[in-house]
């Protein structure tokens, strides 16, 4: 009865989805913690390499409490520690498989990832992979003119001219409004 009243008072919006069981729309798991500590619940060990890291992330995305993942993390920040420990071409191959799987496994979800504002090898490779594969997965560059290198920003601009992404986010304003850990 209380829930029905909240629906009638427009406190709760059903998003025109009908009488489906309630589940959160947007969740923000701590993916960094998952990679560093693993998950007893999902029987995942801490990631030791890029293969482990991408497998753990895909597993976590699959079991998102919202049914579909929405924000899949600051991927360059999450993956760079693993990318930087392997040959670039090998890392590129793993990232291609990962990005393709994200695109194919969650085609009907508004899935998005962030990179930047710092330039990392993982961020540069993800831009390269995205440009090559032309997937629909959303990608945003957290841009900060005092931090983001011009060549990294230009790589993102070249992608945007071909793919209409990455999107550019004013990182300093977001930090000002929401703090360093915004999503």
Which sequence ranges carry the predicted segments?
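Conserved catalytic cores of very large enzyme subunits
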Residues: 1-183
């Amino acid at each position: 009865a209380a829930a029905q009243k909240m629906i009638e008072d427009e406190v709760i919006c059903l998003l025109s989805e009908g009488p489906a069981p309630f589940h959160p729309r947007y969740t923000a798991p701590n993916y960094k913690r998952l990679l560093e500590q693993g998950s007893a619940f999902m029987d995942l060990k801490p990631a030791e390499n890029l293969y482990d890291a991408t497998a753990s992330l895909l597993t976590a995305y699959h079991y998102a409490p919202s049914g579909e993942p929405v924000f899949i993390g600051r991927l360059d920040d999450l993956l760079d520690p693993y990318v930087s420990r392997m040959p670039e071409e090998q890392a590129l191959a793993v990232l291609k498989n990962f990005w393709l799987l994200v695109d194919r496994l969650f085609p009907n979800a508004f899935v998005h990832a962030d990179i930047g504002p710092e330039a990392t090898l993982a961020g540069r490779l993800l831009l390269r992979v995205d440009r090559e594969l032309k997937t629909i997965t959303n990608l945003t560059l957290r841009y900060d003119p005092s931090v983001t290198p011009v060549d990294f920003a230009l790589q993102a601009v070249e992608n945007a001219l071909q793919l209409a992404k990455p999107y550019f986010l004013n990182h300093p304003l977001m930090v000002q409004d929401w703090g360093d850990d915004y999503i």
